[in-house]
């Protein structure tokens, strides 16, 4: 597992295999990552909070909970996403925004979820530009929004 806290900068490549908790956790940071590969996490594969994030390419498989979790007033942009085997592929919550430009999601009951988890925050918003997911694989709580442009 890797955890960045209050980090700023660019990362070329991250590879994580067999994590017993969240595989990659980034908090209070401003990070641009070119490529992320994660396999086999007991909890979330990628967990982002309180920051601004750009991920160019992410390929994740076998996430115990969420493939990607964006929360606590974060802004995140994902250019190319592949997620295989997660409960929720991409969850955005608690006054956060995520833009997902190109996603392929397989074996995940919920592709995208936008909601408020913690009382002190508002809902969340996801903008999806291209995906193989269907509308019935979306979860949107009142006060949150998902814009789907296929």
Tell me the role of every PLM-derived stretch.
Residues 1-150:
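Extracellular beta-rich repeat passengers
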């Amino acid at each position: 597992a890797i955890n960045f806290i209050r980090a700023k900068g660019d990362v070329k490549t991250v590879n994580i295999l067999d994590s017993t908790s969240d595989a990659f956790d980034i908090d209070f940071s401003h990070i641009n990552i070119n490529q992320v590969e994660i396999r086999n996490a007991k909890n979330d594969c990628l967990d982002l909070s309180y920051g601004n994030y750009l991920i160019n390419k992410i390929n994740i498989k076998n996430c115990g909970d969420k493939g990607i979790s964006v929360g606590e007033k974060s802004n995140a942009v994902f250019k190319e996403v592949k997620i295989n085997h997660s409960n929720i592929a991409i969850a955005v919550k608690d006054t956060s925004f995520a833009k997902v430009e190109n996603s392929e999601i397989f074996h995940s009951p919920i592709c995208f979820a936008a909601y408020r988890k913690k009382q002190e925050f508002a809902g969340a918003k996801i903008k999806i530009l291209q995906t193989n997911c269907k509308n019935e694989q979306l979860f949107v709580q009142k006060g949150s929004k998902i814009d789907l442009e296929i």
